[in-house]
């Protein structure tokens, strides 16, 4: 079966033919590639084509596809059972592994997705502060729960629907939206609203393209939250263990009240988490009145994969230096080639995360990101795919470097960039 036929058949049985909108490739006027398998830095589609994969399952695969250590851990766990709906030692082991590196985090709760993690963190913040409103930032994406699907990035931005049908006005009105990297917009909202339970932010935004928050902005944001008895939530579902081993904390050293984790923490399996100090976490059921649960939360296969992934990342002290150097080489190379061709391009990286925009002006917020030439992006994406490079099919997503990549792979990618630019 070909990719084309597979998508046609999928559309008969699956809404939109995919189980997450951006996978449909609709924004780049194309059809999705159906993947048969992956190995290291590469994925292979059912037509027999191979691609250097810079999506890496949208971030979880720090060690690439089919990493032997993670596979071995999963196989060992599976041999004992796939799910119990009861506590296992693996949950405590992964909890200790995460908390040992964050001095301000004392307890953690595992869930199955980033959406669950942020949704639960919001409920927890409201329960702790006894306040109703939340503040988020335009273009930041925190999953598809109703209160957070307002002025969102990621797939919502990709399909030009930053909010969603079905989100009730009564819910949306309790979500305040500020401008990313603009502290004055935050101050204005706090002046008008005294009942803000929490501020949630991607400290390294990866869902409007890659746009890191400025250090002074985050420092001032933390002060405002503290002065107003408002909890600060860092959504590190994407940046955790990606931007650095300690995520944004390893870069900006700001201690958020609650941190959400995902992607890498599950080693490629469905796992996420939220963590905070004990006085906050202890109001979760069964100790307190904030309810959260999940049949597959703490699934043993996901816990085993997470332990293997984080243990390996922690042991390889030079891993993040290597990934950062490769990302820097890629983004600087793309910028140089674009300049030579006379194309407007902004490119940056934070650790193993990278992003690029087809615009002449620097990008520091969602409105800047929207200035990117989407037609140019679509042509570039199509050309790169034809040259064997698999990039996210959306201008408003982030790319990822994995440990199986090297200088040769980056050189091959940059040659594909050169050829792709020639055809634009």
Which sequence ranges carry the predicted segments?
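Conserved N-terminal phosphate-binding loop of PLP-dependent enzymes in the Aspartate aminotransferase
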Residues: 1-424
């Amino acid at each position: 079966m070909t990719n084309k036929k597979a998508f046609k058949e999928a559309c008969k049985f699956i809404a939109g033919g995919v189980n997450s909108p951006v996978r449909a490739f609709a924004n780049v006027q194309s059809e999705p590639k159906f993947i048969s398998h992956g190995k290291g830095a590469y994925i292979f589609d059912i037509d027999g084509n191979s691609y250097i994969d810079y999506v890496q399952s949208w971030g979880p695969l720090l060690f690439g596809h089919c990493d032997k250590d993670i596979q071995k851990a999963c196989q060992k766990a599976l041999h004992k059972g796939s799910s119990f709906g009861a506590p296992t030692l693996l949950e405590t082991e992964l909890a200790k592994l995460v908390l040992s590196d964050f001095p301000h985090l004392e307890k953690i709760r595992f869930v199955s997705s980033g959406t669950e993690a942020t949704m639960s963190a919001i409920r927890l913040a409201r329960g702790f502060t006894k306040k109703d409103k939340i503040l988020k930032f335009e273009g930041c994406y925190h999953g598809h729960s109703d209160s957070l699907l307002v002025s969102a990035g990621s797939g919502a931005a990709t399909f030009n629907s930053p909010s969603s049908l079905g989100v009730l006005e009564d819910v949306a009105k309790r979500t305040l939206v500020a401008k990313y990297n603009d502290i004055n917009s935050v101050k204005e909202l706090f002046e008008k609203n005294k009942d803000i339970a929490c501020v949630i932010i991607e400290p390294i935004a990866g869902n409007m393209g890659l746009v890191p928050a400025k250090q002074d902005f985050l420092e001032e944001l933390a002060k405002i939250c503290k002065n107003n008895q408002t909890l600060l939530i860092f959504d590190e579902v994407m940046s955790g263990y990606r931007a650095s081993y300690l995520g944004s904390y390893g870069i900006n050293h700001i201690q958020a009240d609650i941190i959400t984790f995902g992607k890498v923490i599950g080693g490629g399996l469905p796992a996420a988490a939220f963590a905070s100090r004990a006085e906050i976490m202890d109001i979760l059921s069964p100790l307190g009145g904030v309810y959260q649960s999940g049949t597959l939360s703490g699934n043993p296969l996901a816990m085993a994969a997470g332990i293997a992934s984080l243990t390996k990342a922690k042991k390889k002290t030079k891993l993040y230096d290597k990934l950062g150097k490769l990302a820097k080489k890629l983004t600087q190379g793309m910028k140089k080639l674009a300049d030579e061709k006379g194309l407007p391009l902004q490119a940056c990286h934070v650790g193993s995360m990278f992003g690029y925009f087809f615009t002449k002006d620097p990008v520091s917020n969602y409105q800047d990101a929207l200035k990117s030439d989407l037609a140019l992006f679509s042509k570039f994406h199509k050309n790169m795919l034809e040259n064997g490079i698999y990039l996210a099919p959306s201008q408003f997503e982030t790319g990822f470097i994995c440990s199986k990549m090297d200088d040769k792979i980056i050189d091959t990618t940059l040659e594909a960039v050169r050829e792709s630019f020639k055809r634009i």
